Structures are given as C-alpha cells and as structure tokens.
Amino acid sequence: MKAEGLSGGYGDSRLINNVSLTVEKGEFLGILGPNGSGKTTLLHLLTGTLPAKKGRVYLAGKLLADYKPKELAQIMAVLPQKMDQAFTFTVEETVAFGRYPFQTGLFRQQTEKGEAIVQEAMEQTGVADFAQKPIRELSGGEQQRVYLAQALAQQPRILFLDEPTNFLDLAYQKDLLDLIKRLTRESGLAAVSVFHDLNTASLYCDGLMFMKNGTAGPKQKPEYAVTEQSIKAVYDTDVTALVHQSSPKPMIVIQPEKDSVKRQSIPFEALLQAGRDDILLQTEIPLRTLSSTPIGAGFSWSRTLIHKRLPDQPDPIEGLTACLSESGFQLQETCAMASSERLDRFVYRTYEDGELSVFICVQTGFSIWILINGYAADQFFIKALMAAEAERTKVLGDGGGTGDILIAATQTQQSENIEQRLNQLIKKGTAECIKEAAELFE
C-alpha cells in the first residue's frame, strides 16, 4: 500500500494533513499518537471508508478509488475498535461473512474450500469451541476475536486494525498479536494497526509512525522511533526508556509526579544488624539496586539486603531461596548473598560530602555493600560496581576477593556534580574499608 499527500476529515474539517506512507508486503506498521491526533481518521482514509479531500491511496499498485467494493474486499480486511451486532448470528455465521466477497451464483452458497477457511480462521483465533453460540452472548473480548476471525476468513493481502487489543485480557492480546505477526512473517500479510500502548507496538511492529495534530512523522524502526525525546515531543509528558530483557525493542515507562516532601537520609549504620550467621539491613522505602548476588541479581528494587551463612550446597541459589522463604523474607524485594564462613567480622564506614553520604560495608569473602543516600543513574551503578571491583583488585591482587558486590541508592537528592562526588567517596571509602578488612580477616 502507498499513500501520497493524504488530507481529509469529516464535513468541512481537515483533520489529516498531507500524510504519506508506504506499507510493504509482510510488514506490520503501527500508528501511534495521543487522543485526537487523527489515528482513526487516517485509518478511515487509508481504507476508503472516508473519502480523502486531497491525495491518493494505492493498493497493490492500483488506485483505491478504482476498486469495486467486492474486489476490494478480496484483498483488504478491516477490524474496527468495536462492532455493534444488531442481529443474532452464531459465531460461525459471523466468521463466514468473511467469505462473502468470494461467493458467486444466485444463492451465494459456501464452497468446501470456503468452509475449510472459515474453520481454520476460527481455530486460529480460538473461537471454534463456541462456533454455534450467538455472538451477542459473548464478552467484548470474545467478540473481538470473532471479528478478527471474520477478517482472516477474507484471506486479505492487507489487514487494517483499530486498537485491536482494547477488549482483550493479556493472554488474548498476546495470542492475537502473535498470530498477526506470524501471518505477516509466513504468509506475507501486510498489517496496519492503530495502537495506544507504546510498548506493545514497539514489540510487535516492524515500523512505527507517530501522529500529532493531524500530521504524521516519518515511519521508523522501533529502535529509532521510541526514544525519550520523541515520546515527550509527541505526548508532552516525561517518560523513561528501558531496554527489554529479551528483545532489542525499547520499552517506555511513565514518570509519576515526584513526592514534594523531602525524604530524610536513611541511617544505614543504625539499621545494620549483624551476627555470626547473617548481616541484615532493611529499609521502609525501596532502594534501587545493582548486584551480582544470587538473589536479586542485576537491576532491581529492594527493601531487604542480607548476607546469610549457609553450608556449601549443590545448588546455592535453591538453598538460599528456601532458607529465606522459610524465614519469611519477600524474595521479590530482597537482595541476598551467602557464605559458608562466619559473618560477624566485617568493616563499615559512612563517608559524607554535604548532603550526600555513602555507607560502605566489607564482609566475609570481601563481599562489598555500597549504599548511597542520593540519586544515581543506571550507568553510574555500573561504574560504581566496576570501581569497587577495581579497588578490591588493587588492594588484594587478582583473585584476592571473590565475594558479591551490591550497589544501592535511595534515588533522592539530585545534586550538582553528583556522579563526580559520589565516585570520589566510593573509591576512597572502598579502598580504606578493604584494607582494614584485610587486616581484620588475617
């Protein structure tokens, strides 16, 4: 499909201004934008349900306006946001309407091939089990799946969808989009869909196009389209871009309004509890953490930091998990490490620079906790972990300390030159505490 200089709207209004785009065979294009930006209106112009005031749309190399309705229905299908069902047709009868453009003769009877296509479409969308049920008795999500089956029964070359997952629960959202993605990949189906959910569109679409005030930006791969700057420009709100764990597609999270009440620094030293078998620190507010610990590894948010003494086990993670669960700790908000040696010998200090403070604790095996009263960006966490490892190696030599390293921050008190100041505190404090711990452990 190709659209050139498309403009139009309802009545005398022009809601869409000079939009051009192309959709190739096998491509999944997502159209995004705030409410009232013109997404659905553009879809109506692309499908011909709303005549364009200016511009042209080509489908399979032919002007959209030159297609007869039946001819167009054989290559294009549309799944709107919601369809009102005025008649009590069964699910199978509703899906079978998708074969209407292919029926011939006076009585337009269904062929064996058509019946097989209808059955396949129902199975693909998970509605075959209630094929004889009246569609009006189904939930909104079930009806949406029936209408998708109807669209697939047309065996279109291009499929248009307007917020197709609106009435679906998470499992069926995934099933529907997995199916569409699979059809684009295996059957060459072209798909154009309006989305509200940025992350869903980023995960499934090959290209994204943002709209604002009736104009459209360029079509781009999600990796280039979904950035903090572009989202702020389109939606006029602050967001944070994240990296998906199993896909190169970027994810976006919104930023809630910050608490206007200034939080007090956490007295890490006062909260530290230690004995022969564990070192424990718990806070009321969650800490942003980066660690190499068996439980809570990588980036997470934790209220409980614990170093537990456990005998050597075949599966250390399983043993530590069982021990913590039996003790009533919430694993989803816990960073935990384990050692087989006694834990009541350790070194800790607090280092301060104005409103910033860093609590450093060096424990058995030269495990290191670095707890920051202040804000740290994700990249600084990584730098801090590397700096701690470098200082440990400098003092002890290669292989001198193999314990886990944990970095945590309250994520409050953003200050000028914060990274430089924190880095100085961490390097100085880590070196001093490791040297003192080395003497203690001897």
From Swiss-Prot:
Enzyme class, UniProt record, top EC level = translocase
Q: Which PROSITE patterns match?
A: ABC_TRANSPORTER_2
The ABC transporter domain is annotated at: 1-238
A Pfam family of this chain? ABC_tran
Q: Give the EC number(s) listed in the UniProt record.
A: 7.-.-.-
UniProt-annotated binding residues for ATP: G33, P34, N35, G36, S37, G38, K39, T40
**Transmembrane portions of the chain:** none
Keywords in UniProt for this one?
ATP-binding, Nucleotide-binding, Translocase, Transport
* Alphabetized InterPro entries for the sequence: AAA+_ATPase, ABC_transporter-like_ATP-bd, P-loop_NTPase
Keyword Lipid biosynthesis in annotation: no
**One Gene Ontology molecular-function label:** ATP hydrolysis activity
SUPFAM superfamilies registered for this protein in UniProt = P-loop containing nucleoside triphosphate hydrolases
Fill in the subunit field for this protein: The complex is composed of two ATP-binding proteins (YvrA), two transmembrane proteins (YvrB) and a solute-binding protein (YvrC).
Q: Which family does it belong to?
A: Belongs to the ABC transporter superfamily.
Function, as annotated, reads: Probably part of an ABC transporter complex. Probably responsible for energy coupling to the transport system.
Record's protein name: Uncharacterized ABC transporter ATP-binding protein YvrA
What is the native source organism of this protein? Answer: Bacillus subtilis (strain 168)
